[in-house]
Amino acid sequence: MSCAGRAGPARLAALALLTCSLWPARADNASQEYYTALINVTVQEPGRGAPLTFRIDRGRYGLDSPKAEVRGQVLAPLPLHGVADHLGCDPQTRFFVPPNIKQWIALLQRGNCTFKEKISRAAFHNAVAVVIYNNKSKEEPVTMTHPGTGDIIAVMITELRGKDILSYLEKNISVQMTIAVGTRMPPKNFSRGSLVFVSISFIVLMIISSAWLIFYFIQKIRYTNARDRNQRRLGDAAKKAISKLTTRTVKKGDKETDPDFDHCAVCIESYKQNDVVRILPCKHVFHKSCVDPWLSEHCTCPMCKLNILKALGIVPNLPCTDNVAFDMERLTRTQAVNRRSALGDLAGDNSLGLEPLRTSGISPLPQDGELTPRTGEINIAVTKEWFIIASFGLLSALTLCYMIIRATASLNANEVEWF
């Protein structure tokens, strides 16, 4: 597995954290208690006997508004330069107040300026209250912030109800409104401090995950370096062991030239006169040019898989890096027997001149306890550790994301808006 591949879960965790950090963009607003507003609207249409009455239960008092009951006729701003003015943000905003009206309530739409500006302009024209309807149809009323607006009452309602009332005003139909204090809604328990606590917890979890990840890479580098170092030392030992093996030149009449004699197991060619052959401790014969490269890499006989390092007594317990499947346990049990029988056969063969074994000058190699695990074992262990580390980090990111989204959903009901 490449480093880029391993970094995939880390990038995914970072992306999950970034997404969660962008989600509660407005979660910095203080969680405040608020009061609901119960609004009764009475519409007196000309030519209709009984007035039309409906109730709005989803109103909300502004944070800085007096929580009091008020009643009055609803008025909308006059058009400016022939264009309807529903926002009340222009300094030239005016209201037409009939002389017989003592108390009136301004109806304005949210947007384009702060709540404080809207409320202040209505108060300047002696409105007793301001009803601001939302500018998004699917959004609930929010708690408005408008410090310094005095004793004027400010309430927000939904866009749907606001436009219903505005439609009557545009037809010059009289609309009366009564605003009463509803229920006090306490602040939610999940506050900004809780978000900070969750964030700190996530950071701690990520630090632990990162520490494990760094430990993994250090161990991986150590395993790789140790394996490469042992392979180099094993190769050097194999070369020195090869130099201890007997070689001779095939002559006319030797048994190797007999048609019934086994061919070289490496190149599958028969032996010819003047061929240089190598005799292994197991008594198998091969072309020197064929078997030397094999022994340098595998240090075992191509036919019986005898470990020449063990057979020659150079490194008794060093396993070779032979990728061909064979029974290592069986070979270890019968190692001593094979070595004695092989050396005895070689010594009794008059056609072979076996040199005495010399082990001096060969650098000691690590024993079994010092060797690293096999490649398969390392890969299994590393894959398992990496899966745990990656899963831990990703789970931490997703857990934080879930908690922040839940916290944001709780805070949405208590959001404080300025405009």
From Swiss-Prot:
In vivo measurements suggest this protein is glycosylated. In contrast, in vitro experiments failed to detect glycosylation. Residues 218-419 are cytoplasmic. SUPFAM superfamilies: PA domain, RING/U-box. It is a single-pass type I membrane protein. Pathway: Protein modification; protein ubiquitination. It holds the Pfam family PA. It catalyses: S-ubiquitinyl-[E2 ubiquitin-conjugating enzyme]-L-cysteine + [acceptor protein]-L-lysine = [E2 ubiquitin-conjugating enzyme]-L-cysteine + N(6)-ubiquitinyl-[acceptor protein]-L-lysine. Its EC number is 2.3.2.27. Residues 1-27 form the signal peptide. Residues 28-194 are extracellular. GO terms for biological process: apoptotic process; programmed cell death; protein ubiquitination; ubiquitin-dependent protein catabolic process. InterPro entries: PA_dom_sf, PA_domain, RING_finger_E3_ligase, Znf_RING, Znf_RING/FYVE/PHD. Gene3D superfamilies: 3.50.30.30, Zinc/RING finger domain, C3HC4 (zinc finger). The chain crosses the membrane at residues 195-217. It comes from the Eukaryota. Keywords: Apoptosis, Cytoplasm, Glycoprotein, Membrane, Metal-binding, Phosphoprotein, Signal, Transferase, Transmembrane, Transmembrane helix, Ubl conjugation pathway, Zinc, Zinc-finger. GO terms for cellular component: cytoplasm; membrane. It is found in: Membrane; Cytoplasm. Ubiquitously expressed. Highly expressed in leukocytes. Not expressed in erythroblasts. This is E3 ubiquitin-protein ligase RNF130. It comes from Homo sapiens. The lineage of its organism: Eukaryota, Metazoa, Chordata, Craniata, Vertebrata. The gene is RNF130.
